[in-house]
Amino acid sequence: HGAVDEMAHAETFHGYAPDLGYEFLRSAMAKNDYQAKGCDIKADEIFISDGAKEDCGNIQEIFSKDSKIAVCDPVYPVYVDTNVMAGRTGTYDAAAGTWSNVIYMPCTKETNFAPELPKETPDIIYLCFPNNPTGSTVTKEQLQTWVDYANKTGAVIIYDAAYEAYISEKEVPHSIYECEGARTCAIEIRSFSKNAGFTGVRLSATVIPKDIKSGDVMLHSLWARRHGTKFNGTSYIIQKAGEAVYSDAGKEQLSAQVAYYMNNAKVIKEGLKDAGYNVSGGVNAPYIWLETPKGMTSWDFFDYLLEKANV
């Protein structure tokens, strides 16, 4: 509340925030989220924004229009839809529900809902772990395979780590920068909504190491230019709240909140399993992924829940 009090007085009022983020929050993130886990990420490689959804949607603007994207299937819609809006995805096949210039990487029960390396080489690879919507994760060894692949092919990985606070298994990495070589191929996006409940407050970060290029272009400086051109910075009050997340009290409260959501997921998962459904997830993410019964499509099951079960 100290930041609110500061903003209430002319002598301590803060105007436009630094467009790339206040140093106090960038340093807190670098220290706690990365350096504490052995990741070589510095404060000036972290860009503060007002929501991971915005960052996931806006990051494609610094890439060429003819860049080809690869996405998991199923996928968080923002990755595809913003590229559609940018004119990058080709023509739409309504019957198949796919775009001609998008590489789809199936995530099925047979692959433990994790993607396999695509046969066609993409320019941009969207990965989200723990995954929205399936709740699946990959081990550090599996993620290293993707980093090696991206460095070999020249692709850039957009790594959505919004749900990293829910990871409970030691073999599951909290950041792609735990993998060797990730600084030269990966951009990571973090959210304060999923761990700290900033849903109506809005705060996020995009991490772009100074080593990463697309072709001959340094993406760190390009994103800094784009960010400064289109964004006037997240408010001082919100960024001070973000800094408080890394205090001892903040960490304790976050741990309790994550445990609450994971217990909800446990109750849902166990209830569905007891009812005879095949389900996964709920271990490193608050998502439960359910196999629809009797050959129903996802939309049929959704309508059934809405109209018959009142869910």
What residue ranges belong to the model's regions?
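Active-site phosphate-binding strand-loop segment of PLP-dependent enzymes
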Residues: 93-174
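Conserved glycine-rich beta-strand-loop-beta hairpin in the small C-terminal domain of fold type I
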Residues: 243, 258-269, 278-292, 298
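Conserved core segment of the aminotransferase class I/II
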Residues: 84, 178-259, 266-270
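N-terminal small-domain helix-loop-helix segment of the aminotransferase-like
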Residues: 1-51, 245-249, 266
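A short helix->loop->beta-strand "cap" motif at the edges of active sites that frequently abuts
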Residues: 67, 152-155, 183-184
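Conserved PLP-anchoring active-site segment centered on the Schiff-base-forming lysine
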Residues: 62-83
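Conserved beta-loop-alpha segment that forms the PLP phosphate-binding cup at the N-terminus of a helix
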Residues: 22-25, 42-67, 199-204
